[in-house]
Amino acid sequence: MSTPEPTGGPVTDEERRAAGMATRREVLGDAHVDRAVAGSTPFTADFQDFITRTAWGDLWQRPGLARRDRSLLTLAITVALRHWDEFALHVRAAKNNGLTDEEIGEVLQHCAIYAGVPAANHAFAVARPILEELRAASPS
């Protein structure tokens, strides 16, 4: 097995942590990240660091997919796995990454066939008030 080509991304844990925290804040928003960090305990601190370094400092840094595409995938996966808190969080992230309400709706329609109508139905119920809130808060 050959060694993958370097991506030019972060290499050390500290670089991954810094890049991950920056990306996490850009995608999820400062308010969410501040709550997650403030809510960290000695029991959860290592897990929060793991998420920041691996999910945000490694996976979301890879050049193969744009953040917008990663958001599409994340929405679909969280619906399929019925992880509703993560789904709600990533509806907001998807908007931050440039997805429209219509595109989010299309993801959920697609999920109805591949992940089940009950999951997609619940996803619409979770997404609707979030999208309404974001529309109301957006300067038009």
Task: Label every PLM stretch briefly.
Residues 62-70, 84, 101, 105, ...:
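Alpha-helix N-cap/helix-initiation sites
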Residues 2-68, 96, 122-140:
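Acidic, glycine/proline-rich low-complexity segments that act as flexible tails and inter-domain linkers
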Residues 117:
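Substrate/cofactor-recognition hotspot
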